[in-house]
């Protein structure tokens, strides 16, 4: 440009127009490059998948390989101490909002007809990225609310195609004892697969039947890829969250794929899920945008092992909906060529909540957490919330040696604080003693008068409480940790004074009904 401007004064007048056109081209190209320089963000999830089911962790121990998921890890960073939540809705809400489930009230598995769901006062990754010119699409399982106002397209996404519940709820209408009257189904039955857009269009494409479950991930991944192709053609940065229905139970694999794992139908579904991940990676390569796309793979929560053999596996104690690590630690890996070191492993503590501030930082807004404390506008809404996530971008890109997160607060689906992890230490305040079968969902968490103490570096699988003859002596010698832990929890709870919980967690028992009756009686 300097050369062009220097020559401008000696140019003949008839070349002024040519120069103007050239400078306009340079300006437009620079503007397009600036938009392109913002990374695309692709989030691909499974459902209820365990660490053992991914061959990157177990080298084929389960009898099959997952080469495409493994590729993300091999070309990026794998986490050993990564946390989801204890169940589906909790894991998804904490990811997309960057807030604790105790703050949003979205800790209980969402059921058809439930009133709880995404609230308009809570920002999302998608909505905040709109400020940076991103196209946003969500495809696959949502599980963040049953009503239209809770759909992703009312919370920052341009397009959504997917289902709203867990798979076993979707197939309930096919049960022989399911009520046949239309009124029951309209009030309590699952909605179909929804296709909606931000302009208010909502289409119910029909029920997610057992037969349709065989191909629903084909349909939603195809739609996601079509969305990506469109944005790539227009040179627009995009954020896509694809969340497959695999491997939530019950697994229904199409006939032509049965046997591809050499194991059982569940394993066939896992291999198929890996192929879906491969579709996305291949498309990024084909479009030539892989180097400018951050790819994150994970799942919502730990395995639902009480449905075995239609279930995932984990080396950690416990399973979904417990206070044990098996319900919380999930496989996680992230790839960003040239930014995140390939083949690296991280022992830092990280949680789903951390991606909101991290993705916003990658888009150029590293102070979104501070802005939201006082009020920040996005998608024509003014949000004022306390983010519980941390910005991991400096750590992921090698600028910082350690990640910013030191703690994990374990909330049950009822919204009770069951445990705290601080660095290597874990204190358990409420214990789920029914560790096996469906009783883990039915039986209550038991409050402890004195918490249990664990060191998750020396005993990551939480075996000492079961096997050690000298555990209590070891505990007593470290009782000095109890009071500081209480103080740490108190500091966290103080944040709720100015940023109180949005809603109370849903309940599967009569507790909420009784609360409503008591509230109504008191208002007379």
Pin down the residues of each PLM region.
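Short, Lys/Arg-enriched N-terminal segments with co-localized hydrophobic residues
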Residues: 1-10
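Formylglycine-dependent sulfatase
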Residues: 12-21, 30-447, 451, 460-524
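Compositionally biased, low-complexity intrinsically disordered regions
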Residues: 5, 21-23
């Amino acid at each position: 440009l300097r050369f062009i401007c220097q020559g401008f004064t000696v140019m003949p007048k008839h070349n002024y127009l040519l120069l103007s056109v050239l400078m306009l081209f340079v300006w437009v190209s620079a503007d397009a490059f600036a938009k392109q320089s913002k990374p695309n963000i692709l989030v691909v999830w499974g459902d209820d998948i365990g660490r053992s089911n991914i061959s990157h962790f177990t080298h084929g121990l389960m009898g099959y390989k997952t080469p495409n998921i493994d590729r993300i890890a091999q070309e990026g960073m794998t986490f050993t101490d990564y946390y989801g939540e204890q169940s589906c809705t909790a894991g998804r809400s904490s990811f997309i909002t960057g807030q604790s489930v105790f703050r949003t009230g979205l800790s209980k598995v969402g059921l058809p007809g439930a009133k709880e769901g995404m609230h308009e006062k809570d920002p999302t990754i998608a909505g905040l990225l709109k400020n940076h010119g991103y196209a946003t699409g969500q495809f696959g399982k949502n599980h963040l609310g049953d009503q239209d106002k809770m759909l992703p397209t009312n919370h920052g996404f341009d397009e959504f195609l997917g289902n709203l519940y867990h798979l076993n709820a979707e197939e309930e209408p096919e049960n022989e004892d399911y009520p046949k009257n239309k009124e029951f189904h309209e009030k309590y039955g699952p909605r179909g697969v929804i296709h909606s857009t931000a302009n208010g269009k909502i289409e119910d494409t029909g029920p997610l039947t057992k037969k349709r479950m065989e191909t629903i991930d084909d349909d939603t991944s195809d739609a996601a890829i079509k969305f990506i192709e469109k944005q790539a053609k227009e040179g627009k940065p995009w954020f896509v969250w694809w969340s497959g229905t695999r491997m939530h139970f019950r697994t229904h694999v199409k006939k032509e794929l049965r046997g591809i794992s050499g194991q059982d139908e569940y394993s066939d579904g896992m291999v198929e899920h890996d192929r879906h991940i491969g579709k996305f990676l291949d498309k990024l390569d084909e479009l030539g945008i892989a180097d400018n796309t951050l790819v994150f793979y994970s799942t919502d929560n730990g395995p639902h092992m009480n449905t075995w053999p239609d279930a995932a596996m984990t080396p950690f104690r416990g399973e979904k909906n417990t206070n044990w690590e098996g319900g919380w630690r999930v496989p996680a890996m992230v790839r960003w060529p040239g930014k995140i070191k390939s083949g690296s492993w991280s022992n830092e503590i990280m949680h789903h909540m951390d991606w909101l501030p991290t993705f916003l930082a990658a888009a150029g807004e590293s102070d979104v957490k501070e802005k939201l404390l006082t009020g920040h506008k996005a998608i024509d809404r003014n949000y004022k919330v306390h983010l519980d996530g941390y910005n991991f971008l400096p750590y992921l890109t090698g600028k910082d040696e350690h990640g910013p997160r030191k703690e994990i607060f374990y909330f049950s689906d009822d919204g009770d604080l069951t445990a705290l992890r601080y660095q290597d230490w874990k204190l358990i305040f409420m214990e789920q003693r029914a560790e096996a079968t469906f009783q883990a969902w039915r039986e209550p968490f038991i409050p402890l008068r004195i918490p249990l103490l664990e060191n998750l570096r020396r005993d990551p699988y939480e075996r000492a409480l079961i096997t050690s003859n000298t555990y209590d002596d070891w505990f007593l010698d470290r009782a000095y940790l109890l009071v500081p832990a209480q103080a740490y929890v108190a500091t966290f709870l103080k944040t709720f004074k100015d940023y109180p919980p949005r809603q109370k967690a849903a309940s599967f028992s009569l507790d909420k009904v009784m609360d409503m009756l008591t509230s109504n009686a008191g208002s007379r």
